[in-house]
């Protein structure tokens, strides 16, 4: 077994080709100075590799739900398991984020409310009742017998069609205003007012019960779920929707969406979900005489910007008003909608999509400008910053801050509203859930998941938080722990958790709670990797890996890797030196004196207990306390706003200041910019100076470049391909790859020609702050700004790194650096919130030095902090506590550190060791033995399908074979239970929307509990679908990787001349102009975008400074006027004379033009002539032929780059009628064409018919063979029927065309690749993609071993090629379509795909992996399976034949019989299965023969003759051509069938795939048993009395099926992000038919019960129905009598489906001679079924039929009359073909 995780050759970011090793199930602590490479190793390498490998094995719809990580640059990875990461993402919180939404508590609550909530009418608060049909019947049943009942259905007014339909159905009366009126009076007008149709009047008694049911269901159908019942002067109204009888108001059923304030449909109509109502106090705030266009509302978005102009114009268009209308002239309704929105108002808007790079149509929900502001206020910790002057806000009076609709707010669950739960603390919520009575299983599962999530949050020290608390108001530590809680609830084993400084924000007292949670994860059997600086956490670690020795370029090496004790004793790293106190942060010898005091009173925000605190000025004050004690509430939410108010207004009622203070700098963790374009160099205002420096270089002036060209944020200098980002997102897995155009440099080539001190502008951005500080020594201003970064411990930070990728601590230090750069003379108060986040102790020392320098300058600093190194150097300490939440909010200490350690507060206890002399070393407990990992997967009370409530254990890290007869429960156990439970458990690690996608098709398994699970990968044969568009290479993503490799390092060549292609760029165009048109003039234009509105685009371009437009071969001013018609309008970029000195201007203009459009048109005036030339960026050969740019990632999957002939499919579809003459015997050529293409004209067929002399009314059966062939293939003058049908098919959807009429051939133009021909000419080492796809694994391996570039990608491809070799598919052509593979090859390809992840600690579930495999192929596949176990995985296989029994480590045998008599766990060792032993007793006399020839790339056979009326077996290794030979026999057989039907009258081809079944297919319909039984039931007296027709005895007709479950007998209960639950339909009781049908009974069974009866029972009960006895008897003979008559085909096991298929076609054979072709049909059968099959095959032969079967089982070869042994994969011929040498004939 793999006992180590090893990653070698890591070169990610600054990591220097390092190798890292650690053991599974360890807590590994990554430490080192800030910027040393810890996160690069943990997240960008280990996490990225583990996650990507596992996601690749999941369904693609799930893998694409997550933003894929790029492949890390690692040479080799061993022992990695699936990974889950928890990173610091404080700045990524959505504006609406609350504790409830972030931790998914709201999702749990919404689900429970929807499943169990009681709805109430919001106005009357009366409970709403949703009546099911059976509940209505039970209500009516309570009415005394003998009562007259009248059933009525609501009827709309003025609806003539409804009146006519009612008359047609036989209804005669309508109730209008309490008066009964004949309905025929309203035949032409409809009823004048809403009324009620009288459906039936009857006396309630037993004999009328069936009639009552019929009438009730009819009434509900007519009334769309509503009906009225009149009796004894009473009126009752029923509805299948939630309805209040008093008001008749109807409400939708409860759903999770109803309890979300973001739901467009269900949010509060007044505040539009914000929960806040903003009122306008100053009537003059809106300027009445101005219009919206003139910005009459100062708090609305500026209408002069393109964004808001577009939105407001769309709103105006939707509501029918003008933006230029003064506000006072707008109607009150329009004014209200503009300010407060309108319920359900959605407006179409065309906005720019940064992902697509163009404007796209979208829809915006219009909430109103004030409600948009309200959303920001509700979730902000500083509401005042968003509140416009002249307005005030209150809680929304309608929804009371919930943002929910009235209906949602009125709903109760266990007596409480949704808002009640939002206001509870997490501890109170947990207690409430614990007190609930036990629920049914489906509800209990949700509640247990809910409690598990709450338990983790409480264990992490957050019991005091409430779900409604906004994330923006939490401290940094609280945010980190809410994020952490989402990931720690799954009970999986073998997962690698990677945590990013989980101790952030935790007080030392709380850290032990976190440590317990992490220790529990490890003890559960997982690996935990921590990126940490907290000295306490070292006592938790099993291993320490120190990365360093320095930061940035000075780090990236493994300094130490070993136990914590060895680390302290032996390591010389900075971390170890600080831990041993060889280096330390000194306590100041003397504390700074106070310069004044800030006194804050009545602080009561959140949990603060009306505090009064005094904070000294001129000192460093640290605010500390346990988590949740109120630190952020005191400083960020109370003190900061008060100080701001005091400074602005000179007064604050709750604040007084004694001393000088004139400025406040609040440095929080908020991201200063979310754009990828915000970088440290721009933030500290140094980039402008750097750009100016480059603009002053001589080369810059030569090229005509300005300062603007050195910005990657403008099109003048930014790379046009990536827009200045340096990277682009490819369509293969959305990986972000280096831009192939600028190679990550961000800028255009001409910009990079300019150098300063031999460095380009791109080189500057790649420098770290340390490198740049030394580089700019000669530029004092730039040097000073960058040196400030180094002073604050950011020396490792690359100057061009996007700000969004920084941690919270890095952001604060960057902000502090910016503040330090501004010379401040006035006394300033600096407020910092945990600035040590992400800092090593060595960097904390530098930070303290900076803070103390501010103090020495006379400023004041307040720091919220838990780091004891900072606390010990503080001048003054405020400690809040004593606990978190409601038990916190008190001031428990306010003194110096020396005074604090004599108190008994949590901080005092933590601080004492740091003030002791000498300081104590960290406590390292003795290593304790880790609890053993569960040795087994335990399953309790498994009762899926026929499993008999079994309990069992399956060993982990072993190969377990589950054996037993077919349908004994093997598939139910392995796939329906283990796979489902594993999927559900792994999904717990993800947010609800991703979880929902993964488990939406995973039904809740019928089992009490499954423990000991790891992430699961399952491969079922029944789900092994094939896609003809996919090749062998694409199955393992080899094709995508090759595409990426060719994109990155391939060299394009011209497909015409073979010359190297040159790039079309501004430089090449300018060069061409100077070469051929010197001294001429050129006008550079770009076409107007077709999707843009003309006027808005011209206005936009005018604002950008453009002046002219070119159209109709002349120029116009861009501001008009224009003629009525403009032909091909184009924007004029520049007009310039073509001279060498104007080259810079030409380059700049062409660059700008290409940034505006993909094509540029040049209008050239030269030597008295005018010409126009159009250029597109791309590639060009020497002859001027243009090709798309091969370097662009779009080439991977973009419509414009596809082969124009086959449109990217790689094949051409043609219609072939020729082989189907017999099938269409009753058609004429015209009738066939019109039936296939009813919307197309058949007239082109007539000339062909005239030429061939075929009457247009001639049937195909009347046309001779030669004429039919000419009709299909055509003549020299006219297209044939094949070509005409192909042409018609291409004009419509190919998907709607019968697939068996379509013939697919590889596209000649693209050689089957589906892309432009020139792409084939892109080569690596002279080898093209097409050559690779036409070769095998060995060819590609040889090429890749010679490639030195992209080592990580090359290694990935090689590993997958190696896997193809290991599963025995090394011989397969990489471009071969999957559908052309044999069954064995295809299944092994699926295995290879699953095994390609290379992961450990995974459970692999395989379905009969050796079934049907040739003995020579079995060892290689068995070796791969064994290798999986060796690599520390668990493999569980189903094994029908027992072929794996001798190789398995553990055996489970289920049985003893199939179906109801199976499902028992018989033993944990396989029972020996008997092998079929039969004797062939046929005579050896000769029979007619069929001769075939085959010539393909894989097999060459000439004139193979095999006997008819005999059993022939084809055997051989996978890939030897068995299926190809069988297909050839089929084609030859079809040809013979056309010419001479006497040889055999039919051909039946059966493969190993089960019959395709819908949700309605069952045994009774498949074998045509149901019609006879329906006729019988319809003939019964009861049926006639109730007027029930034959068709009503069917669950598949509208009249007969239960209308609530549509005849399925069950309903799916959607539990949102939990697995779907399948429940019997309550209306029909699971019997599928409507209640009326259940009134007709025969032998104690109604028709629904009959469908649930076994075939044995049906055969015995209806022995007199001779027509159904044969199929029933045959099914029973084949041991399928236990199946129920209405058994759904989709619910059968694979072996049962195959047995059904065989029964239909082989055991109920045709009467005339038939050719049976069977392709590995026996591989899904157990040995007993195989014996029965052999008996039947011999019976068929004795009846004169011919059987040819592909089968490697020895018993079939031994019984065959004729044996064909195929050669090895590379032989291309037959080893043996002749009479069976082992068979002695009688």
From Swiss-Prot:
User: What positions does the entry give for ATP binding?
Assistant: 32-39, 964-971, 1516-1523
Q: Please report the organism this UniProt entry assigns to the protein.
A: Chlamydia trachomatis serovar D (strain ATCC VR-885 / DSM 19411 / UW-3/Cx)
On subunit structure and binding partners, the annotation says: Forms a heterotetramer with UvrB during the search for lesions.
Q: Gene3D superfamilies of this UniProt entry?
A: ABC transporter ATPase domain-like, ABC transporter ATPase like domain, ATP-grasp fold, A domain, P-loop containing nucleotide triphosphate hydrolases
Q: Where are the zinc fingers (C4-type)?
A: 719-742, 1602-1628
The record's GO CC annotations read:
cytoplasm; excinuclease repair complex
Q: Which domain of life is it from?
A: Bacteria
Name any Gene Ontology BP term.
nucleotide-excision repair
Question: Which intervals hold domain ABC transporter?
Answer: 314-580, 590-913
Q: Which residues bind ATP 2?
A: 625-632
Q: Which UniProt keywords apply?
A: ATP-binding, Cytoplasm, DNA damage, DNA excision, DNA repair, DNA-binding, Excision nuclease, Metal-binding, Nucleotide-binding, Repeat, SOS response, Zinc, Zinc-finger
The record's subcellular locations are: Cytoplasm
Q: What is the lineage of its organism?
A: Bacteria, Pseudomonadati, Chlamydiota, Chlamydiia, Chlamydiales
**Protein name listed in UniProt:** UvrABC system protein A
Free-text function comment from the UniProt entry: The UvrABC repair system catalyzes the recognition and processing of DNA lesions. UvrA is an ATPase and a DNA-binding protein. A damage recognition complex composed of 2 UvrA and 2 UvrB subunits scans DNA for abnormalities. When the presence of a lesion has been verified by UvrB, the UvrA molecules dissociate.
Which SUPFAM superfamilies does the record match to this protein? P-loop containing nucleoside triphosphate hydrolases
Q: What residues bind ATP 1, as annotated?
A: 410-417
State the family named in the UniProt similarity comment for this chain.
Belongs to the ABC transporter superfamily. UvrA family.
Molecular-function annotations in GO: ATP binding; ATP hydrolysis activity; DNA binding; nuclease activity; zinc ion binding
